């Protein structure tokens, strides 16, 4: 029986951190034994908010592949590929962009949240938002449909991106006939690792992460400086970690 195709991806903007590993990476390692698994290194999408630092993206591609192999992804079981090496993805992105309005992209909750988080790049009210960043959900739709991905591992916060992909598939198939596979969400209980500063999310750009490539002394220094709950004095005190 042919395995179902599952596709996921990650932007190369630095090494993997613990949030990546516990939130997604360890799940990918399990999925490679059950599905025809594709892992995309989304270097083109990484440029949408790193357009002024292409060297960072270029270097991070190699670092990211090494990290993915180190956590247990097996090239004999999972296909790891670099987005920019497949020109057909860029072609599909252009075709799909004709099926999506600017207003629809602006309403995407995930995109709206990310714009707010990147005020230093796009301005306080998003007045400097680029077409490339606003339209990255269209690029993601091209990634998924190019490989006929039936299942896409996502967290709850990423569901709006997958829903936009499904809308594109519906519209394309209505116009040109049943051609594209409609993807479904592969939801799993993935933990969200808090940042060292107490932030709800650990992130590279937030400067609150422990990276898989960190040296032991660096990890120790980061942990010693991490924010803890001042109300938890004794071990049996209730905590808010």
Stretches with model-predicted labels:
Residues 1-13, 33-34, 66, 70, ...:
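Non-catalytic terminal extensions that flank enzyme cores
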Residues 112-241:
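Active-site cores that bind ATP or allylic diphosphates and position pyrophosphate for catalysis
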Residues 2-141:
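N-terminal Rossmann-like or analogous alpha/beta NTP/dinucleotide-binding catalytic cores
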